[in-house]
Amino acid sequence: MDKTRRRTLVALAFAALGGARLAHAQQPGVNYTVLKPEQPVNAPGKIEVLEFFWYGCIHCYNLEPVLEPWLKGLAPDIQFRRVPAIFNPRWAHDAKTFFSLEAMGVGEKLHRPLFDAIHQDRLRTDDAQAFNAWLQRQGVDVKRFEEVIKSFGVQSKVRQAQQLTVGYRIDGTPAMAVHGRYTVSVDQGGSQRGLLKIVDHLVALTRKSLPAAR
């Protein structure tokens, strides 16, 4: 056997061993939670991944620089969606803000800038004067925003987000859920990168059981 082939076989063997160790290391109840009952998903033919977050959560803010490149590398069979977790009226207000910006078509564009404004500039979304001034600086029509935030569509999405928070038994943020079957927190992942590695593992588990998602 020539040296090149031998090295290739050794590398493949180590890769297989590493993958087996990784799968073995991810233990249900320790590194992630198995949901019982499973929650309904809204991603026909795809694997649904949800991120539960709150704009005021420093851990969610710290996840963003790691999450952004991860999202760019998502496989086409994965559908990712952000869900503002809701535990109290303050969180519900930020959920309304999130869904209003989304409805106006600027949600993705302003997601990171809003995080920055909150955690770097101490902006509060419940300070109407300060927040409206921030919206104006971003080129958002404040009058239109004030109409949208009171709309039936936004109120419905807030109720749905609250139901998802309860249904997925989310007790802190950030947390991620995979296809209605699993949830994982930063504590379970050990770090932001660890969280995403476990999500990758759970996506792989789900993919094996969903032929249509391959």
Language-model segments: what does each one mean?
Residues 55-59, 86-90, 116-121, 151-154, ...:
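Solvent-exposed loop/turn segments at secondary-structure junctions
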Residues 12-13, 114, 149:
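A general structural motif at alpha-helix termini
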Residues 44-47, 92, 126, 190:
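Residues at secondary-structure transition points
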Residues 64-71, 94-98, 111, 128, ...:
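Extracytoplasmic/secreted envelope proteins and their assembly/folding machinery
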Residues 73-104, 108-136:
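Structural microenvironment flanking redox-active thiols in thiol-disulfide oxidoreductases
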Residues 137-214:
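C-terminal cap of thioredoxin/glutaredoxin-like
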Residues 61-64, 91-95, 189-192:
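Conserved strand-to-helix beginnings and helix N-cap segments that scaffold or border functional pockets
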Residues 2-89, 162, 204-214:
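Extracytoplasmic thiol/disulfide redox context detector
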